């Protein structure tokens, strides 16, 4: 039988079995062939079991981003194994083998007509070089061997350190380099090490040109546009303005277009669960067949190496919540869901109008954007035709070759050099002398009674309507009564302009020079001297003085003026002064208010405080309300102002507006309306807001040229303590901007809200200061009664309390929950602020201020930015971080004009650093500094030159504070990984991890976060696993703003209270025991701190009970130690 089978069978050349053979995985040292299974002739049962085994296995994505040294060693072992296998047996070797190999290599490098990669059957696409955009560049254009050309103009010099280059060579994208010859790798590495970074920025020696203009009208438009960004960051008190939302200028169409492109690039066809299972099984079957056939034998060995490396380098972040013992478990991690909105009803007419804004402002903004986007083809300077004709560019007067700190950033905010003698405008001021004007004020009639009350009581509440004279006269009465002999007479004002103007007026009434007997102290300016007796200042300045002198020994009397505004600093000062009054019986505290809420102030100071009311108003004011609700408050205010101006009555006009953009639009519309009329009388339109330069602010107090009428357009800065001579007409739209803390984004937001009834009455009183006036309210009488709050919500109840907590801790307040606030903030907000400061390292485990916290108090920044600056000095990158913090303190520096969005985006691509938006800001500033701070360079690259100038000023100010704190200014060169780690040290609490393609989630809260299309990380083709962001902007999605890629290890190192790394050796029990030991250690520290606090409290109580330390006898005419002048620096 066997012989018959042999006769009909063709014998093979070797003793191998035929048919489908499934080989087992080779075992080292075993060369025995695999025996076929006896159960199935073709081995189908084994194949089916193998298939089921693979089907049960779960595929894991290889997220490893780098090839480390261990992987390279594994690859080299594979190469050695294959070389050893090839050396076995007998081989034929020719002497001409090397020569032929060189010949073959040269043939491969030089494409011939017969062989190559190009398709000969079709037409070749011509290649056009467009060197302006990186998307149209060849990827290796600047790195080709033997190329002597300069880098392209788009490739800005983004510094890269040796660490970055090495990390890229070890990444998955360079795995093919492992298969090159050793000589090729050595040569490439040598070229990389000795390659010098070339600066692709054009030389700026020739480029010192100012934008040319066709006529004077165009120059005026350009100058007007530059004013729009003037003083945007001063005095906004760290608030986020909706007008300067970094994503506000980005159109919805652009966002949808970029996101659609990204989805089309990354979106996969949707499959059902059954289809996915079938597809997965087919892939496993194909891979198995390829592996068995020997085609991809090495891929299996390499994949095993990568799997081992993935398991080795994969970092798992564990989220935890450690609560310090001083909070006693009272922390609430879910912050307040909705911000406190200071309106009666969010659906009322005025609230809806405030949220919608002005239509006239929106239309004018669009027109300005179109003008800005207009390409000026008539300009010949710098063009090819202009070069042929010899037209040269004008010298750029804005270019500044000096260093960052060469200019005096304080000059533009100092009022003393711009203040002139006030000239009388109204008949009342021109006909009466200063003495007669003082005696005409209502406060003069009750002067003696008021001073008797002040002498008999330490705390007095004085209520007087606007214009009664309490601000200017009260300090002079105290001086005349002898209070200036034993110390200073201080008077606080809520705003800088108010402090400056009142000091100017009091100096004129006393007949002394400003800065001598009467002076003022505001931010960036201290206009006082050794002779100063009456000192006007902002409430923030007095709060800062409490840091150095908790008892305020240099003051004999303090006047808290305009206390009804209830600013944040005012409420904190009330709590501190209450403690000071209890310790000092010789200190007089006078609280003045223009509203009838004196009982609240009296109850706060013990209930025994007398209340003195100044009767009467200076001049009557006629009140007019709108008949119907107004749709556009800007357009209505402009029409009313033109109507008043064209009427027969004399007197200046005061118009209230919410913000800077509304003010600028109102001024321009008034000028346009009057320009359309024939023979219209002249009108001087003057804006005033806190961001305006001091020289322009001072113009409102001066007489208009030619005696023409003035129309002053102001924010609520003109509500209190600001007397402009000649104001007889007031136009009140009924809106203002207020800071409201939004816990979701973690910062304050400046938004437009309806004013309160008390503020409306204050605005009405502005018309009756120097004569009978009229007030036009652009809202109905019903809206005044039903849609306006009785009084303004205190700022302390609607703002971020982190800076307040930090300041109170620096003042020695141990238990903040027991601190005396007139209107205590929500306890949850206070506890959350304390918890945030503890996570930043400003508070220790016992709730006391740390050395880092004391340094953070000195910076007028958010605590997070202060932490970043302090950590940068320790990490050796303070110069770079100082620039980044300064860039974050100003509005958006990029702009996208309509019609030229793509060109602006292409320019922006030059500056983007793929790992970080923060580093992109740093790169922009470095390039601007390289171009000698040129304004033309900013215009060419679609950058706001005014915003960058403010960055220089902020940087100089912060640098001065760092020098005072002995923090070194160090630059780390091109090692920007250290900068990213420093950013992570401050924003680790805003960390997000990758969830899907283009989608992140907050590591702690799970809130979805998305990259905005304008981010440098959007669409770069590589999504980092972890990022930190500056803030969340709530628009169509929860977009992250200012994103930086970080490593997971950094989060665990810099934020141990939130994150920890899971180690394979640690069990769950060991992790729990470790957390218990941490809590026990903190509780032991808290017990020791409580004992120390009790001991200090007992000592302070004993010292307070001693009569010799609590009372002092002061002789009349003697100088006290409190009169010693201390050097003061502003906020």
Swiss-Prot record:
Q: Which Pfam families match?
A: DEAD, HA2_C, HA2_N, Helicase_C, OB_NTP_bind
- What are the protein's GO molecular function terms? 3'-5' RNA helicase activity; ATP binding; ATP hydrolysis activity; RNA binding
Q: Which CDD domains match?
A: DEXHc_DHX38, SF2_C_RHA
Q: Which residues form the Helicase C-terminal domain?
A: 629-812
A single Gene Ontology CC annotation of this entry is: spliceosomal complex
Report the catalytic activity.
ATP + H2O = ADP + phosphate + H(+)
Q: What does this protein do?
A: Probable ATP-binding RNA helicase involved in pre-mRNA splicing.
Family stated for the protein in its record? Belongs to the DEAD box helicase family. DEAH subfamily. PRP16 sub-subfamily.
Q: What is this protein called?
A: Probable pre-mRNA-splicing factor ATP-dependent RNA helicase mog-1
Q: Which organism is it from?
A: Caenorhabditis elegans
Give the classification, highest ranks. Answer: Eukaryota, Metazoa, Ecdysozoa, Nematoda, Chromadorea
């Amino acid at each position: 039988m066997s012989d018959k089978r042999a006769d009909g069978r063709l014998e093979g050349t070797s003793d191998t079995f035929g048919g489908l053979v499934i080989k087992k995985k080779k075992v080292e040292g075993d060369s025995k062939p695999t025996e076929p299974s006896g159960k199935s002739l073709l081995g189908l049962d084994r194949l089916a079991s193998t298939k089921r085994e693979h089907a049960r296995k779960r595929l894991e994505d290889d997220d490893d981003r780098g090839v480390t040294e261990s992987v390279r060693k594994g690859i080299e072992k594979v190469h050695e194994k294959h070389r050893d296998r090839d050396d076995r047996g007998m081989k034929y070797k020719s002497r001409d083998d090397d020569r032929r190999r060189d010949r073959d290599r040269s043939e491969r490098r030089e494409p011939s007509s017969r062989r190559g990669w190009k398709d000969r059957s079709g037409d070749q696409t011509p290649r056009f070089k467009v060197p302006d955009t990186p998307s149209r560049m060849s990827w290796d254009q600047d790195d080709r061997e033997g190329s002597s050309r300069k880098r392209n103009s788009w490739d800005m010099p983004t510094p890269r350190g040796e660490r970055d280059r090495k990390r890229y060579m070890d990444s998955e994208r360079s795995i093919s380099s492992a298969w090159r010859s050793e000589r090729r790798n050595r040569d490439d590495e040598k070229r990389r090490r000795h390659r010098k970074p070339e600066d692709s920025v054009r030389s700026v020696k020739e480029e010192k040109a100012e934008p040319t203009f066709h006529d004077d009208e165009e120059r005026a438009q350009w100058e007007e546009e530059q004013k729009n960004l003037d003083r945007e960051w001063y005095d906004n008190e760290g608030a986020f303005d909706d007008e300067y939302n970094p994503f506000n200028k980005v159109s919805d169409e652009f966002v949808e277009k970029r996101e659609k492109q990204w989805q089309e690039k990354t979106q996969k066809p949707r499959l059902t669960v059954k289809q996915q299972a079938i597809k997965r099984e087919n892939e496993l079957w194909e891979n198995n067949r390829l592996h068995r056939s020997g085609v991809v034998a090495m891929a299996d060995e390499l994949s095993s190496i990568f799997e081992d490396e993935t398991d080795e380098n994969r970092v798992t972040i564990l989220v935890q919540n450690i609560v310090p013992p001083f909070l006693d478990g009272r922390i609430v991690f879910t912050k307040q869901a909705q911000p406190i909105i200071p309106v009666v009803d969010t659906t009322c007419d005025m609230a809806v109008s405030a949220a919608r804004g002005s239509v006239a402002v929106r239309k004018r903004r669009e027109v300005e954007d179109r003008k800005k986007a207009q390409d000026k083809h008539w300009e010949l300077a710098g063009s090819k035709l202009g070069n042929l004709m010899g037209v040269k560019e004008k010298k750029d007067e804005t270019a500044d070759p000096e260093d960052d700190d060469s200019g005096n950033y304080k000059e533009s905010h100092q009022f003393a050099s711009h203040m002139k003698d006030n000239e009388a405008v109204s008949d009342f001021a021109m006909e009466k002398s200063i003495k007669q004007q003082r005696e005409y004020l209502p406060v003069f009639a009750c002067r003696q009674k008021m001073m008797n009350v002040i002498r008999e009581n330490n705390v007095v509440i004085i209520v007087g309507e606007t214009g009664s004279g309490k601000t200017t006269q009260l300090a002079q009465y105290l001086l005349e009564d002898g209070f200036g002999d034993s110390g200073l007479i201080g008077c606080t004002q809520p705003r800088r302009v108010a402090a400056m103007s009142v000091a100017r007026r009091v100096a004129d009434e006393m007949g002394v020079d400003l800065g001598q007997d009467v002076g003022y102290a505001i931010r960036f300016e201290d206009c006082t001297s050794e002779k100063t007796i009456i000192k006007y200042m902002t409430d923030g300045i007095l709060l800062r003085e409490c840091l150095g002198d908790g008892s305020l020994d240099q003051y004999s009397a303090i006047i808290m003026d305009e206390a009804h505004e209830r600013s944040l600093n005012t409420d904190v000062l009330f709590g501190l002064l209450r403690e000071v009054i209890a310790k000092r019986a010789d200190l007089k505290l006078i609280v003045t208010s223009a509203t009838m809420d004196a009982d609240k102030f009296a109850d706060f100071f013990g209930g025994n405080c007398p209340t003195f009311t100044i009767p009467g108003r200076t001049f009557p004011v006629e009140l007019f309300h709108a008949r119907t609700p107004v749709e556009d408050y800007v357009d209505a205010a402009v029409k009313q102002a033109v109507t008043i101006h064209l009427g027969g009555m004399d007197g200046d006009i005061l118009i209230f507006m919410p913000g800077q953009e509304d003010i600028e639009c109102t001024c321009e519309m008034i000028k346009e309306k009057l320009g359309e009329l024939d023979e219209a009388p002249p009108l001087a339109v003057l804006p005033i807001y806190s961001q305006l330069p001091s020289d322009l602010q001072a113009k409102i107090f001066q007489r208009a040229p030619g005696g023409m009428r003035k129309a002053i357009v102001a924010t609520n800065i003109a509500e209190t303590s600001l007397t402009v001579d000649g104001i007889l007409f007031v136009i009140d739209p009924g809106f203002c901007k207020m800071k409201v803390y939004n816990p979701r984004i973690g910062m304050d937001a400046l938004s437009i809200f309806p004013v309160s009834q008390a503020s409306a009455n204050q605005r009405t009183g502005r018309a009756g200061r120097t004569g009978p006036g009229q007030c036009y309210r652009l809202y109905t009488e019903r809206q005044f009664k039903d849609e306006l709050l009785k009084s303004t919500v205190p700022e302390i109840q609607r703002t971020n309390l982190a800076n307040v907590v930090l300041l109170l801790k620096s003042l020695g307040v141990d238990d903040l929950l027991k601190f005396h606030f007139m209107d205590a903030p929500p306890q949850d907000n206070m506890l959350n602020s304390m918890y945030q400061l503890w996570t930043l390292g400003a508070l220790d485990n016992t709730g006391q201020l740390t050395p880092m916290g004391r340094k953070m108090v000195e910076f007028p920044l958010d605590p997070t930015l202060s932490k970043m600056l302090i950590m940068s000095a320790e990490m050796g990158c303070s110069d770079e971080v100082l620039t980044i913090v300064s860039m974050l303190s100003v509005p958006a520096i990029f702009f996208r004009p309509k019609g030229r969005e793509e060109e602006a985006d292409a320019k922006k691509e030059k500056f983007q650093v793929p790992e970080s938006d923060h580093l992109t800001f740093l790169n922009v500033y470095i390039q601007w500094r390289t171009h000698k701070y040129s304004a033309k360079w900013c215009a060419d690259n679609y950058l706001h030159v005014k915003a960058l100038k403010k960055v220089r000023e902020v940087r100089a100010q912060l640098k001065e504070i760092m020098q005072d704190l002995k923090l070194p200014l160090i630059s780390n060169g091109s090692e920007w990984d250290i900068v990213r780690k420093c950013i992570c040290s401050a924003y680790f609490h805003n960390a997000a991890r990758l969830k899907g393609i283009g989608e992140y989630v907050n590591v702690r809260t799970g809130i979805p976060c998305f990259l905005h299309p304008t981010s440098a990380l959007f669409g770069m083709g590589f999504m980092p696993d972890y990022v930190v962001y500056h803030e969340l902007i709530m628009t169509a999605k929860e977009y992250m703003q200012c994103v930086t890629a970080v490593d997971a290890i950094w989060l665990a190192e810099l934020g141990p209270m939130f994150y920890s790394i899971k180690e394979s050796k640690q069990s769950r029990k060991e992790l729990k025991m470790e957390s218990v030991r941490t809590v026990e250690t903190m509780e032991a520290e808290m017990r020791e701190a409580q004992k120390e606090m009790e001991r200090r409290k007992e000592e302070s109580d004993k010292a307070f009970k001693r009569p010799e330390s609590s009372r002092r006898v002061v002789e009349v005419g003697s100088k006290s130690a409190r009169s010693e002048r201390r050097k003061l620096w502003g906020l």
